[in-house]
Amino acid sequence: MAWYGLALSTAYGARTEDPGPADGSVSGGTDNLAVPLAVAAVVLAVAAFTWARRRWRTTTRTTPAVTVWGGPHPGAAEPGLSPALDARSRADLVDTDDAVRTSEEELGFAVARHGEAAAAPFTEAVAYARAELATAFRSRQRLDDTLPEDEAEGRRVLDGIIRRCADANARLDAVSGDFDRLRALEREAPEAVAGAESAFRALLDRVPAAEAALDAMRERYAPSAYAPVAGSIGEAQDRLVFATSSLNQARQAVDAGRHPEAAVRLRAAEGAVTQARVLVDGVERRAAELAEAAERLPDALTGAETDLTDAGALLKGSADDVPGGVARAEEVLGEVRAGTVSGPYDPMDALHEVVEAGAALDGVLAGIRGPERGDGRTRALLEQSSLTARSALGAATDFVGTHRGAVGDQARTRLAEAGRHWERARELSAADDPRGALPEARRAEALAVRALDLAERDVRAYQERRGPGDPGIGGGVGGAVLGGIVLGGVFGEGADGHGGELGGGLGTGGFPGGPGSFGGGATRGRRGGGV
């Protein structure tokens, strides 16, 4: 791991000690020996990593319906589902989701440089692909929720998932060449590299403040409060180490007139900086969300306790199950209030518990108190639930996006469904229907929490399967592969885990697996950058 310390100290040195040469290179001057050694380290690290990764996939994804990408599944396909077709549909969901995510990131760079009007055709293509993928995820969720009546019905649904994924990929592939011509990374490599170096430095300046925010959360809250971002600073630094190496190599390629190579290095660096920014943003956002939850909690508790008093007075003599529900709500609220004064606590979890208790009481009182007071109370619960749902959705989205090299179809399906319910909650809220919006927001939160749990499970399994003989990954390459920034590998393995056109070396002394590009399955591993 010596390269980690070298690269990170180089990166921080560019910020704190020396602004660097006028050409804007990240390292503040490139040593003739250091960069070749760094390139060699990256090549060896990717080779080791992809060997372990391929061994993992050989024992997982290539065994239909037993274990597919992203974690274990039942030993046999569910009744009514073809094992091979089920495995293929799950793999297609993962691959298509990766293609759409990468295309969205690349589209952001194009819009920033060329404007929304020039990028409009590609925005439309990504929107189409995202919609097709969302429908496919919805079908997968329905299969997970309710088994098909027979194999014919299961085949029809699985065929639909595969077809939707194919349509999404085809739409992205169809415009990938035009996208390359718009970005023109090879032609505009010097300007593009300079822009990426500027973005790198700007993000690097934010890391100490984000680290301080994480330390403050550790001091103030219970561990569960900051758990979703506990490792984010370390991972952000890991991505920045990889970006340092990639940007230095891109700058060298530009200076030597090797613009095609510079374009490949640049895309890798841009992907790493983007993920590092997501991780840093996530820490800052979590700190703000916890502060907001702590601020909202007293009023939320007071409102729920008022409901509890009303319920106790109005429901005397009611059926046994109703007073029982009130008693359970009373117990939860008592535990939350006690927890807030007994030491560090998790304000987000506390607010969630209060919302759940309040929603139960609101349901009990809905037919008793007047509509004006009832709707006002539901709106208050919706505001509180919206915070917890938005926080859970953001945490899951960030984790899946920055670990997509290991996250499988189950986590992604739950995340897609969480997003769908969240959008529905927002629509109903905007239509002044708090009673309709509240259960949608609560469902979104539950699905997002489940998605994060499944994604973390996938990453743990991914890391465990590397085995005790894994020599370790340096230069930030491990994080780059885990984050889906680097595709393929030295063994010619494709991004879909079956081998193919995405693998192999650059042929120019570069790392074996290249970065992803805008496009679907047929084009996202291309090397060119547009001329």
Language-model features: locations:
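Long, charged/polar, soluble alpha-helical segments
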Residues: 1-531
